[in-house]
Amino acid sequence: MKVLKLITVVALMMLFVTGCNIKTESPEQLAKIPDYDDTKKVLYDGIDQLLKPDSSMILPSNTKEVGKINKVDLNSDGIDELVVFEQKEDLSNNVSQVGFVTLSYNGEKYVLGDHFLENGESIEYANFYDLDSDGYKEVILLVKSKDKTNMHIYKVVDNEITKIYDLDASWLQNKEDFNDMKVKIGYIDGDDKLDILMLHLNNKTNEMFASVANFDGKMKIKDSVKFENVKNLSELYITLGNVASSVGNSSAAIKGIVLDIPILKDNNYITQILYMKDGKINKAFSDYDKTITKSYYIPVDDIDKDKIIEIPIVAGSTGNNKNTYSSKSSATISWYRWNGKEGADSSLIFTSQIYYNYKYNFKLFIPNNLFDKILVEQEFVGEKAV
């Protein structure tokens, strides 16, 4: 629907809001001060005046990628539109809807365009990609309604929003039992086409399927792979990028997916690498390989800046000796990268070992010839560190 209402908040053209997360991103970021800009309040106030009394702005769960208010060139004309995520609540009937509203700039003012709402309580994921390469960025939402999360895709043309796709996970047997979902979009297999990684979890059986697809108006599934004993998706982390250097005569790095998965056994995590080969999803390791198991989540990182993702493993995290792994205030972390090989030849290659002290904000590089031969501990006299 079109609403002929104009706003003259000039600041909207210059400002936009993204999510804020003060959680440590990596062992390399020992301390991080969140950014704050009080001029963003001008933007919030301007948008608030446009929303109906029973509506408010809402922040999707993937706060590192989007905010409540986003500047996006949806139609590739060089001019950014505003996409604002909103929630509408009917308290008398206990009904909640979530969705988004668009605003376009006509050269002088922002014009309130269209809005679209879905029944649901939260937006678990939101982003903007030209999935079908037609020059228009689609708006992708994961909406949670009661106990079910599903994906919806929209296109905005001439300020009108059209829903072009509701996901039907028909490739999954007993699809109705897979009620939780997570998504990541990016270049996964090196074919220069945007891929959609979809994770579906059966909360009753703790089975999860990871599926890779392309979208051209319809969802084209490339392949799926199964995981067992998955605790939940809310604590699962996805990283896309180069997962191994070139192998054999190939000069290109291997692109893939790194999944940090919370598992039921001992409330541990496993770090698994997925990659595409001959149209199929492959796992780099066995899910039961103890070398990829850790007691809590530690983000992967490109520790040596070679554009290959390294996997962190903490001293004492495997085997019977876990006493050095009990404290989150400090840790001795060994960094490894995958060798890019398959089957029995697949293994991790040691890169470096670093001691991190998060309480006192310092790190200590351990020489490679002393790898796993020394233990770094903090000494205290009373309440003071020596």
Q: Locations of the language-model features?
A:
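Beta-propeller-forming repeat regions
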Residues: 19-382
